[in-house]
């Protein structure tokens, strides 16, 4: 009997899912609107989603990563770095691979209002001589790389490489609701070839399965979670449908088609899409998005946002993404975002062709509808209707 109990406890320990709660906060865009600064920001920082997905070879010798693409991100979690742990609010971003946070060596105004890592307060920190540069708009964040223990939920990820900022020019990061970014994409797109956090977790035997999953709640504040090392079926209904990853860099898959009202509106001969928790909206080729905006009656307001009549929301059709033969409808109530007294279109245009054609980004608007499993062991995504 004792042996059976021990075997049961062992099996339970091997199936532990490490959950990190995510909190939904006001996005950087909302903060800028409230401060009356969005127009000025957009004049000098033109958001260009395509730059986030350019190959590493397209950049200079110093690794770069764009920041203005996090303008609409709303979901954030807390991690600890160092011994004892210093806490940071980060974006868990499946569209990038590096971890970085502000440091005490940064004298920029943006750093002064965010948590800053102090290496001298950590007994486990190890410095390196490698530099890191993260571009945004007309300036760039510069810093260096170091190693330390990173606590994610109840996982202690030792000897993890991460970036520490020393300079954050420009004013817009001052209003950012996050301190840094924790990338969850493949190591092949990591700046400076730094080992991503999840890879280090797996290499150190800290998770029982080589996968993580994400549930984004539609609730205004709570309920969202990222889970490492397992799948919790209470977060979805029906069964998971598995989709092969087509490029092991981003979490990239093949779309069969995109339709509205039964008509193909884009991706007629299949196309590529990236499932990205670090992008809030649904993004695609500018011409296709322009047609969709016209179809749903969206028009640009003085802040540069595409506005839709709130009264028309429930009469508009679903947009349907067919993936690996399965249809994934996204209703208008999901792709139109209600903000105060306005209704904002959840579509954004960008132009970035892949070797197989046009590229789409399935951001939080999509992920709120579909619980997503990021399976590194089998290089596949699992999708099921969110509970």
UniProtKB/Swiss-Prot annotation:
Key words, A-Z: Aspartyl protease, Digestion, Disulfide bond, Hydrolase, Protease, Secreted, Signal, Zymogen
Subcellular location: Secreted
Propeptide intervals in chain numbering: 16-59
Catalytically driven reaction(s): Preferential cleavage: hydrophobic, preferably aromatic, residues in P1 and P1' positions. Cleaves 1-Phe-|-Val-2, 4-Gln-|-His-5, 13-Glu-|-Ala-14, 14-Ala-|-Leu-15, 15-Leu-|-Tyr-16, 16-Tyr-|-Leu-17, 23-Gly-|-Phe-24, 24-Phe-|-Phe-25 and 25-Phe-|-Tyr-26 bonds in the B chain of insulin
Protein's UniProt name: Pepsin-3
Highest taxon in the source lineage: Eukaryota
Function, as annotated: Shows particularly broad specificity; although bonds involving phenylalanine and leucine are preferred, many others are also cleaved to some extent.
InterPro entries cross-referenced by the UniProt entry: Aspartic_peptidase_A1, Aspartic_peptidase_AS, Aspartic_peptidase_N, Pepsin_A, PEPTIDASE_A1, Peptidase_aspartic_dom_sf
Family: Belongs to the peptidase A1 family.
E.C. no: 3.4.23.1
CDD domains assigned to the protein according to its UniProt record, in alphabetical order: pepsin_A
Disulfide bonds: 106-111, 267-271, 310-343
Gene3D superfamilies xref list: 6.10.140.60, Acid Proteases (2.40.70.10)
GO molecular function: aspartic-type endopeptidase activity
Catalytic site: 93, 276
Enzyme class: hydrolase
Signal peptide per UniProt: 1-15
Gene Ontology terms: biological process: digestion; proteolysis
GO cellular component, one term: extracellular region
Species per Swiss-Prot/TrEMBL record: Oryctolagus cuniculus (Rabbit)
Sequence ranges assigned to domain Peptidase A1 in this UniProt record: 75-384
